[in-house]
Amino acid sequence: MDSLEKIKEEVISCKKCKLWQFRTNAVPGEGYPKAEIMFVGEAPGENEDKEGRPFVGAAGKLLTQMIKEILGLERDQVFITNVVKCRPPNNRDPEEDEITACSPYLDRQIDIIMPKIIVTLGRHSTKYIFSKMGENFSSITKVRGKSYVWKYKEKEIIVFPTYHPAAALYNPNLRKILEEDFKKIRELAITPKRYTIDYFLGGKNRSWDKREKSDSNSGK
């Protein structure tokens, strides 16, 4: 029987792509095995490679802060991982062959956890999950801030793309957008069925579009 611990052991010893040659530690992911919210980034950075844990650098601290302050959850109440489990040299973008080799680990993690919500952080994780859903991906700017329903193995998982926390570290405007997206995630976590219905009635979460227009018109 598959388990998160088994996946962890396989990732730590994995040599399926060239990235194993450069790593200090592989980064399988961590968190609550029955988490309702799963965060998926692109790949580990320097700090993550040193510690063998996801999102422990500056971007990770921002993510942890938003999980606590906006979602009202502790970090160990969610699950955090990446599409690629080893750090690409010099923090370059992961390459397609690396994603192809490594993504089955993520697929298995999703199978085991079966979260209510998958939050994709940045374009690489969003593009990968969208490919699994059969959705077209254009850019993170165009798809972020909306919820999508993934019909997966007789279950509906809400997929919510947003910016990677690293992009918001030195950009106050992006940080504000990221914070607003996390407020939307909080509401989705509270009342997920409402947004599933909205999806089928009006497409990609029309309720948020209406609310944003209302807030804009009221000067909020």
UniProtKB/Swiss-Prot annotation:
Positions annotated to bind uracil = G41, E42, A43, F55, N82, H164
| Pfam families, sorted | UDG
The listed outcome for N171A is: No change in activity
**Which InterPro entries has this protein been placed in?**
Type-4_UDG (IPR053423), UDG_Type-4/5 (IPR051536), Ura-DNA_glyco_family4 (IPR005273), Uracil-DNA_glycosylase-like (IPR005122), Uracil-DNA_glycosylase-like_sf (IPR036895)
Signal peptide coordinates: none
| Top-level taxon in the UniProt lineage | Archaea
Indicate whether Iron-sulfur appears among the record's keywords: yes
Annotated GO biological process = DNA repair
Role, per record: Removes uracil bases that are present in DNA as a result of either deamination of cytosine or misincorporation of dUMP instead of dTMP.
- What name appears for this protein in its UniProt entry? Type-4 uracil-DNA glycosylase
What is the species of this protein? Sulfurisphaera tokodaii (strain DSM 16993 / JCM 10545 / NBRC 100140 / 7) (Sulfolobus tokodaii)
